[in-house]
Each structure stands twice: as C-alpha cells, then as structure tokens.
Amino acid sequence: MNKKKDSLFKTIKKNNIINVITTESFSKKIIKLNKPDWIKIKIPVDTFRIREIKSALRKNNLHSVCEEANCPNLPECFNRGTATFMILGSRCTRNCPFCAVSHGKPNSLNVEEPNNLAKTIFDMGIDYVVITSVVRDDLYDGGAQHFVNCIKSIRKKNKVKIEILVPDFRGRVELILKIFNSGLPDVFNHNVENVPRLYKKVRPGADYKKSLFLLESFKKKYSNIPTKSGLMLGLGEKDTEIIQVMKDLYSNGVTLLTVGQYLQPSINHIPVQRYIPLSEFKNIKKEALSIGFTNAFCGPFVRSSYHASFQANKLIKKI
C-alpha cells in the first residue's frame, strides 16, 4: 500500500466513522470497523407486544416494511403497537443495492388486502397508519389504484390519519394524480433517498428529477395535503449535496423531512462509507429548518415512518 492509501486508511481508522469501504483506492478490499456507540440498538426486555403485532400480520396475510427491510426501529415501534404496512406483495420488481426487501417476479395482487388491512388497523386500535409498498413496475399504474383501494377500505372502518410512502410509479405522474383523486391520504410521502450524483450506484432504477416532479405535481394538485420526503446518509454524499437536495425538496413543495443513517442490511448490499456523528445530524436539522421545512426528523435511526404521527399531526391539525 502506498503512502497516500496508507494515510487514508489511518485517518479512517482513527475517526472510526467508516464501517465498510469498497473503492478503487483499496483495490476493492473490504475493511470492517466497529460501529460507533450511537448506532447500537437496545432490545426491549418485554417482547409480548412485538409477538402480538407479528401474529396479527401473519393472521391477515399482511406484510410490514419493518420486518421486510430489517428496520432497526422494529422493537421500539412494535412495542408501541405501531407498524408500517407494506402492500402489493413482498417482492419488489427492482433490486436497489441498499434495500433488504426481496426482489424478483412479483405475486398477483391480493384483492382481499385492502379489507384485511382495514380490519387489522381496527383491531390494533391505532390512530395513525403509514402504508408503503414494494415497487411494481409490472403494473400499468404502478399499484396506485391498490393504494387508493386500501385508503378507502381503511376510512370505512377507522377514523385514522393515513400517510402513504409511495414509489415513483415510473414517472406516470398525470395518471397517478388522477387515480389518487378518488382516495387521498393525509400525508403524501416519496423518498428521494440520496443525492443525484450517487443515483446510479445507490438507486439505479430511479430518476432524481422524476421524483422531484412527482412531489411537486402532487402538491400543486392537492395543495392542502402535506408532502414529505427522506434521505439516507453515509454512502459518500457531500455536505453541499445534502443541502442542495433539501433546497430542491423544499422548492418543490415538501414541508416534512426525514434524514437518517444508512445501515448495510447484509454483506451483499452496498457498504456504508461513513457513520454520521450525532452533531452532524443536529446541524442538518438546523439547516433544514432554516431552509423552511415545517418539521425535520434527523438522526441515525430516523426512517420515513419513524414517529410519523408525531411529525405530521401538528401540521395536519392546521389544515
């Protein structure tokens, strides 16, 4: 290893901010470092509520993104009796290198899913629900009508606030907006995930500008509904790029923001390049609020649906 590479290695190891690196400078050699203390999760002693939620999901043939995506917040959220439901099956038609959700040929749509979802939400007695989905590029509408069917079924049985976290629908914005007109959510969420420079590596099946256009178009047509988006950090993005993405989101009508740390689900996924210190997350939140966001959740374990009700409820009440 030459002096330049050796110097970089020592800097990385000293700061202990990088978990795994796979770069040309290291000849694609994997270097593993311990996770910092702020990344470690405490498992609750009482797991009864967790088992109860999992049982309800299995009973009604439902999926949660909490389980499918190996979310680090599962113990906390399930213990509070909350879950983010994942519709349209458990197999994604894309294979993003950061995501733990299964991919491959998807199953046919479960027409009973909207009713099963509504019943489960009623049985759980929750007042705020987040619904997301796998990407279904095989469907003409990307699954938009199924989202609407779920929203309608839930509203028939429950007086709950509904947040949806949607895919990009392959850029078919005009069609999607028309479909959602018959069943609108309380919050519309679509994640840009990372900075545009890294899209080919991080989000190869997506287009940054199309994601912004989806968020902008939804807000223009349904101006009374808050729009939301999120970023995951630690993949090689620069501070200036993060700020620019936040400005892009805000200028396209987004008022709610989530920013979290990317955690590598397995050795087969894209490696973490940097663990973001807590102080940097605080600075990112400060910057987001100065840009104009109504609310910004920023921290290592923040995910799109993490404490979603706390973030959105004040804003929804104002509408």
UniProtKB/Swiss-Prot annotation:
GO terms for molecular function: 4 iron, 4 sulfur cluster binding; lipoate synthase activity; metal ion binding. Its EC number is 2.8.1.8. Pathway: Protein modification; protein lipoylation via endogenous pathway; protein N(6)-(lipoyl)lysine from octanoyl-[acyl-carrier-protein]: step 2/2. It is found in: Cytoplasm. Keywords: 4Fe-4S, Cytoplasm, Iron, Iron-sulfur, Metal-binding, S-adenosyl-L-methionine, Transferase. SMART domains: Elp3 (SM00729). Signal peptide: none annotated. Binds 2 [4Fe-4S] clusters per subunit. One cluster is coordinated with 3 cysteines and an exchangeable S-adenosyl-L-methionine. GO terms for cellular component: cytoplasm. [4Fe-4S] cluster 2 binds at residues 92, 96, 99. Gene3D superfamilies: Aldolase class I (3.20.20.70). [4Fe-4S] cluster 1 binds at residues 66, 71, 77, 305. It catalyses: [[Fe-S] cluster scaffold protein carrying a second [4Fe-4S](2+) cluster] + N(6)-octanoyl-L-lysyl-[protein] + 2 oxidized [2Fe-2S]-[ferredoxin] + 2 S-adenosyl-L-methionine + 4 H(+) = [[Fe-S] cluster scaffold protein] + N(6)-[(R)-dihydrolipoyl]-L-lysyl-[protein] + 4 Fe(3+) + 2 hydrogen sulfide + 2 5'-deoxyadenosine + 2 L-methionine + 2 reduced [2Fe-2S]-[ferredoxin]. Residues 78-294 form the Radical SAM core domain. Its cofactor is [4Fe-4S] cluster. Belongs to the radical SAM superfamily. Lipoyl synthase family. This is Lipoyl synthase. It comes from Buchnera aphidicola subsp. Schizaphis graminum (strain Sg). The lineage of its organism: Bacteria, Pseudomonadati, Pseudomonadota, Gammaproteobacteria, Enterobacterales. The gene is lipA.
